[in-house]
Amino acid sequence: MQRARPTLWAAALTLLVLLRGPPVARAGASSAGLGPVVRCEPCDARALAQCAPPPAVCAELVREPGCGCCLTCALSEGQPCGIYTERCGSGLRCQPSPDEARPLQALLDGRGLCVNASAVSRLRAYLLPAPPAPGNASESEEDRSAGSVESPSVSSTHRVSDPKFHPLHSKIIIIKKGHAKDSQRYKVDYESQSTDTQNFSSESKRETEYGPCRREMEDTLNHLKFLNVLSPRGVHIPNCDKKGFYKKKQCRPSKGRKRGFCWCVDKYGQPLPGYTTKGKEDVHCYSMQSK
C-alpha cells in the first residue's frame, strides 16, 4: 500500500503536466501567482543516491515521470506514451490520437503518441481560436453588420425609422417587463400561500390519522436528521402499535455499564398507576394491553 502512493502521485502529476501545457506556459502561470498544483519533493543528494545508473544506450536522458528524480531514456517521436510511461524527448509532447473518443482514458492506458510540440500548438490554435480582445468588440460587430444580407442601397433614414430603435418602442418594452415582473411576484406569493395551506392540511390530517406515539416517533426521527453527532444518550424511540398509539411496555436500552429498564404506560403514553417498576429489567404489564 505504501509503494502504491508514490505511483498514484506520479500519475496525478504527469496528467496535470500533460493537460496544463508546455513548461513555458507553466512557468508563466507560476509567475502570475497561480503556483504549481502539486509540489514535488526536492531531488537532493539523498534522493539521487537511491537511483540506479542510467541506461548506457540512450539518445536522450530525461527524468522519470511524475516526481521521480532518477534518469531514464526519453521516448522518441511517434512512440506510444501515457501517464505511466517515460517522458517524451525534447520538443515533443504526449498527445492522444485526434480521433480518440476518450482522450484522457487513452493517456491513462498509454495509447498516446509523442508528437512535435510546435505542431500541437499550431493545431490547437487552429481548432481553438483565441477570443477577440475587448477593444475589438465593436469592430467585430461592424464586420458582421457589413457581411449581412442587407442591401447597401438602403438609406440611413430607413434604418433610423426601424421600430426597434424608436423611443416609444423602448418605453413599451420597459412597461411590459414591469408587468411581467409584477405577475411573476404575484405568482410566487400565491404559490407560497397555497403551499402553506397544503402543509397545514397535511399536518391536521396526520393528527387525525396517527396516534400520539407515531407522532412522537416521527418527530424524534426528524430531529435526528439535523444532528451532526449521533449519540444514543437521551434518544428514546417509543414502542408504537399499528394504529400509532403507545404499546403497554416501553423500554430504554442499556448504555455501557448502565442497564436498560422498562415501564408500563397506557395507550396515550401516561405511566400506569401501581406499576412503579422503573429500573427493573423484567417488567410484565398485564392490564389495559393496547391492541
Curated annotation (Swiss-Prot):
Residues 28-134 are annotated as: IGF-binding. CDD domains: TY (cd00191). Phosphorylated by FAM20C in the extracellular medium. Phosphorylated by CK2; resulting in decreased nuclear localization. Changing residue 194 to A: Strongly enhanced apoptotic potential. Disulfide bonds join 40-67, 43-69, 51-70, 58-73, 81-94, 88-114, 213-240, 251-262, 264-285. It is found in: Secreted; Nucleus. Residues 130-162, 189-211 are annotated as: Disordered. Expressed by most tissues. Present in plasma. Keywords: Apoptosis, Disulfide bond, Glycoprotein, Growth factor binding, Nucleus, Phosphoprotein, Secreted, Signal. One of its GO terms (cellular component) is insulin-like growth factor binding protein complex. Changing residue 252 to C: In a colorectal cancer sample; somatic mutation. Its main location: secreted. It holds the Pfam family Thyroglobulin_1. Residues 36-117 form the IGFBP N-terminal domain. Induction: Up-regulated in the presence of IGF1, insulin and other growth-stimulating factors such as growth hormone, EGF and phorbol esters. Residues 146-156 have a biased composition (Low complexity). One of its GO terms (molecular function) is insulin-like growth factor I binding. Residues 191-202 have a biased composition (Polar residues). Residues 210-285 form the Thyroglobulin type-1 domain. The modification Phosphoserine is found at residues 148, 194, 201-202. Glycans are attached at residues 116, 136, 199. Interacts with XLKD1. Binds IGF2 more than IGF1. Forms a ternary complex of about 140 to 150 kDa with IGF1 or IGF2 and a 85 kDa glycoprotein (ALS). Interacts with humanin; humanin competes with importin KPNB1 for binding to IGFBP3, blocking IGFBP3 nuclear import and IGFBP3-mediated apoptosis. Interacts with TMEM219. Interacts with RXRA; this interaction modulates the transcriptional activity of RXRA. Interacts with LRP1; this interaction mediates cell growth inhibition independent of IGF1. The thyroglobulin type-1 domain mediates interaction with HN. Multifunctional protein that plays a critical role in regulating the availability of IGFs such as IGF1 and IGF2 to their receptors and thereby regulates IGF-mediated cellular processes including proliferation, differentiation, and apoptosis in a cell-type specific manner. Also exhibits IGF-independent antiproliferative and apoptotic effects mediated by its receptor TMEM219/IGFBP-3R. Inhibits the positive effect of humanin on insulin sensitivity. Promotes testicular germ cell apoptosis. This is Insulin-like growth factor-binding protein 3.
